[in-house]
Amino acid sequence: MEKQLASRKWMSALNAYFFEKSRFQPLGLIRIVLPILCAYQVFRDYEWMQGLTFINPALDKLHEPSMLIKLLGLPFPLAPEYAQPFAVLYYVVAGCAALGLGTRPALFIFGLATIYLVDIDVSRGFFNHEASLISQVLLVLSVAPGSTSFSVDRLLGTLSKQPSGPQKPLWRVLAGPPVPAWGYKLILILLACTYFTAGVSKVRYGGMEWLDGQTLTHYLDGSANPYTPGNKPMYIGPPDVPQQEKWKDGFGIYTYSYGNRQGSPFWQKVGHFITATPLYIQVFAIAATLFELCAFALLLSGWPRVLYLLGAILMHKSIGFLMNLPFIDYQALCFLLIDWRWVVAQVPAGVKTLVKRQAKRVVPGFRAVPEGATSVAQ
């Protein structure tokens, strides 16, 4: 009996967590922003997809189609005659997804097409961290309730219906009714898993050696920056490689280091200043790892979630300034996941509490009184 009661409470809590209805609907805004950012970045890097139609013969041995490309039998590389039609399809569905025209099919097709692009990059040894997460978020949006808010589809649906009762403001009509929160919560889970696994990878593969700050030193002291003098080897491997591990390239290369693309002399100097003091760089390394390992704070409500999302934005801002890797998509997603109406509602209460505390210190015997009454200091 006790087990059944506990099970019911647990299921009730899960049901309330994922399926409670809320008017906080950031999914429509996320649907508008992410396809625009994603399509812009793809156009910046590939324009009309011609860069996906060849393999560099000099690096041919480093190119291996990913498991998904093999499983689905997708073309690799993309055939030249398909490049422009694929590009047109990609940018058109991105626009439809952002506008909310054929919203759910457009999001689904755009998400799958982005995964295909990510997989081509992975096959060439480059993992696109931004697009890999965003493509998953797009697929969630394609089925989650609330993602059609602020869309052309919703506007056309509203205009086609005969209004009954008092008319609502247009923005409220476009926002739509309260919807279950499971889509929003699922995106939070994806984001939490992304940050958490990043922290686990640092501990698993780097251990204490990562926490000593030497990896960050390599990134920030100019060793990985093409804008500073000297050679910048990007592919790395252990000093003593067993012969059986040299099968792919003859060297046993197993990973590569990130490049620091920051060309600003000012931010280069800031990076040098940080790395010049071992304590600073160690604090940065430890703080970043602990922050990522605490990612499941995103599943909590209230200030823990808000503070973590703000911390994530700050972390990406720092990486953007120091390495010119701003992860704009992540920053936008974190910003839009914050319930700013809740934050605004909480801040005045905090300010009032602070004022009351200060008043008690300044005026002995001060007591707050209800609104409409006369304040009395005894």
Predicted segment positions?
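Alpha-helical membrane-anchoring segments
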Residues: M1-Q378
